[in-house]
């Protein structure tokens, strides 16, 4: 699971949990990628696992950096391995948000992100994160990545993208590997778009995302059809 927090140098503000899908093909087959989709929240991160991750991994890391004279301000992303007993191990740290985990997280975040960033970087004399609370949409969000032909080895560029929908309150198409060329949107990287949708259940969010994808087209477009399957099968 992806465990992302915001830090102001002392205090930690956890973001919503998320789970991504690294393999290119359905059923976790094919080569590894930067991520072919994600959903939030991640049921595998139970309240007990969340508390353990904060207690055993996140807080000691932040306090350790402060003790070493390098207090950390910004996003800290911990890639976690969670066993069936709920024990948590850290696979990696990144000083950034995750892609595509961020897209469903942002879809659920009701608090203005600018307010969060300003609070994190406020002068030390001010409250900062001590009394800061994030407001989340209680619904589930899912993001499905549309990748270019040849991804992840040698993604093709320049394919014209058609059928891009207008964003709504429940569906947003995030651009990544796109470029304007001759008045048309074309592919310019491996992971091209991330179609993100909200739903009352993961199944409903999944259906909304895949229904939207049906209207989008570019030559060689590839995507997984099972994003969210882990949570649905739990």
Q: Where are the model-predicted features located?
A:
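Generic C-terminus detector
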Residues: 178-182, 186-234
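Active-site "cap" helix and flanking loop/linker of ATP-utilizing ligase/carboxylase catalytic domains
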Residues: 53-76, 94-170, 181
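Short beta-strand-to-loop capping motifs
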Residues: 5-7, 146-148, 197-199
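Short clusters of hydrophobic/aromatic residues that line enzyme substrate/ligand-binding pockets
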Residues: 24, 36-39, 129, 161-164, ...
């Amino acid at each position: 699971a992806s465990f992302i927090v915001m830090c102001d140098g002392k205090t930690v503000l956890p973001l919503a949990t998320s789970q991504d899908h690294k393999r290119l093909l359905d059923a976790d087959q094919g080569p590894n990628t930067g991520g072919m989709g994600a959903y939030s929240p991640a049921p595998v991160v139970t309240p007990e696992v969340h508390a353990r991750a904060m207690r055993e991994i996140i807080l000691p890391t932040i306090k350790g950096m402060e003790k070493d004279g390098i207090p950390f301000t910004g996003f800290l992303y911990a890639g976690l391995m969670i066993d069936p007993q709920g024990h948590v191990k850290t696979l990696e740290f990144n000083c950034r948000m995750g892609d595509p985990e961020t897209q469903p997280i942002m879809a659920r975040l009701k608090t203005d992100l600018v307010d969060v960033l300003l609070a994190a970087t406020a002068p030390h004399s001010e409250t900062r994160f001590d009394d800061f609370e994030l407001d989340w949409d209680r619904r589930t969000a899912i993001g499905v990545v549309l990748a270019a032909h040849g991804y992840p080895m040698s993604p093709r560029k320049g394919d014209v993208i058609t059928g891009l929908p207008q964003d709504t309150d429940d569906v947003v198409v995030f651009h990544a590997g796109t470029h304007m060329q001759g008045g048309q949107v074309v592919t310019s990287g491996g992971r091209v778009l991330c179609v993100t949708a909200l739903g009352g259940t993961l199944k409903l969010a999944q259906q909304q995302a895949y229904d939207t994808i049906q209207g989008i087209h570019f030559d060689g477009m590839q995507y997984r059809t099972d994003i969210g399957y882990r949570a649905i099968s739990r």
